[in-house]
Amino acid sequence: MANEFRVCDDCKAPNLKTLIPRLKKLDPDAVIKIGCQSYCGPGRKKTFAFVNNRPVAALTEDELIDKIAERLKKR
């Protein structure tokens, strides 16, 4: 089963122009869904993504990518 990344295009913290290519690099076969994730509170302060329906958040995009990579290794 392919991994799924969900990211928000409304929140202020995630920069989709840089985040999506980095997610594709982590897992080229993953499904990436873009749209509101109803995670507005944290999404204003931290960059985040949902990885296989689990939220992952960090203060920077680099930290987020590291956390997502760890999450994928556990799978």
From Swiss-Prot:
Pfam families: DUF1450
Alphabetized HAMAP family for the sequence: UPF0741
Family (UniProt): Belongs to the UPF0741 family.
Protein name (database record): UPF0741 protein GK3412
Signal peptide bounds: none
UniProt superkingdom: Bacteria
